[in-house]
Every structure is written in C-alpha cells, then in structure tokens.
Design a protein with these regions (language model features):
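A detector for short, charged/polar N-terminal pre-domain segments
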Residues: 1-11
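Short basic helix-loop element that most often maps to the first helix and adjoining turn
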Residues: 14-29, 58
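Short alpha-helical DNA-recognition segment
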Residues: 24-43
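Short, conserved catalytic or interaction motifs in soluble domains
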Residues: 46
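DNA major-groove recognition helix of helix-turn-helix/homeodomain DNA-binding modules
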Residues: 54-69
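Short, charged recognition helix plus adjacent turn
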Residues: 71-84
Length: 84
C-alpha cells in the first residue's frame, strides 16, 4: 500500500477532528491551546496543510492522546533481508 502525502495529511486531519469533536472542543479552543489560529486547525483537519512532528505532539498532548493515535492506520512494512 502506498501512502501519498495528501492522503496522509487527510488521515491525520480526520483524526484531529474526530478527537476534537469527541472532547467537545471548537477549532478555536484547540487553536488557542496550541497558540495557533483556528484557520490552521481547519487546514490540518481538511488535509490542506501537513503538521510538523512538533505540532502533532502538541495537538496530541492537548487532545490527551498518544501520538501513535494519528498513525494507527498505517500498515507496518517489513523489509526483507536480501541475503536470506
């Protein structure tokens, strides 16, 4: 399975939105906690912008989830040793 940057950003954004809504936070409230604009949260949630590792960690902390929550859909690919 190949993951494109846009599908990755969209998946992470959907997870942010899902957890934010579960916690009954508005985009503005989450943005205030992260010290960014609500427009930036909106862009993350729509997959229009990607998040840096720092921003993902920051959002995860405020949403009270482990950063792994945002990546659990990704398949684990095992590299095979070519000398086997």
């Amino acid at each position: 399975m190949t993951t494109t940057l846009s599908s990755f950003n969209l998946s992470v954004g959907q997870k942010i939105r899902q957890k934010r809504l579960e916690q009954k936070l508005t985009q503005s409230q989450l943005a205030d906690k992260c010290k960014i604009t609500f427009q930036q949260i909106q862009k993350y949630e729509k997959g229009a912008n990607g998040c840096s590792a720092f921003r993902i960690k920051q959002i995860a902390d405020h949403l009270k989830v482990n950063v792994i929550y945002f990546f659990d859909y990704l398949p684990i690919v095992k590299e095979e040793n070519q000398n086997d």
